[in-house]
Amino acid sequence: MAQISLESIKKIEKYRNTVHKKVHTTYTTFEMDGEKYVQIDTYGHIDRENPEKISQPFQFDRATAEFLVKLLSEEFDLR
């Protein structure tokens, strides 16, 4: 499992984009070493061999959450 590196994240231009299918998603919160984390888990498509297995986990600490809130607010013009 990996966490987002805020030191190296950057915007890139991609010319071939697709919208992915929606999949089952869950989230959990936990604390480790005094720091709170939110983990979002996505699961495979129903036709996968093991659809109950986590496909992609994403972990966010406070700094990452602040970065993503700012990014999404700017990109979607949220107020």
Show which residues each predicted segment covers.
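Mixed-charge, Lys/Arg-enriched low-complexity segments
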Residues: 59-79
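Residue-level preference for alpha-helix termini and adjacent loops
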Residues: 8-11, 26, 57
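Residue-identity detector for glutamine
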Residues: 3, 39, 56-59
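Mobile acidic interaction elements
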Residues: 6, 30, 58-59, 65
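N-terminal functional modules and adjacent low-complexity/disordered segments of proteins
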Residues: 1-4, 25, 71-73
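Negatively charged, low-complexity tracts enriched in Asp/Glu with abundant Ser/Thr
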Residues: 1-21
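Generic structural motif
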Residues: 9-12, 45, 63-65
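A short, structured beta-strand/loop element
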Residues: 21-54
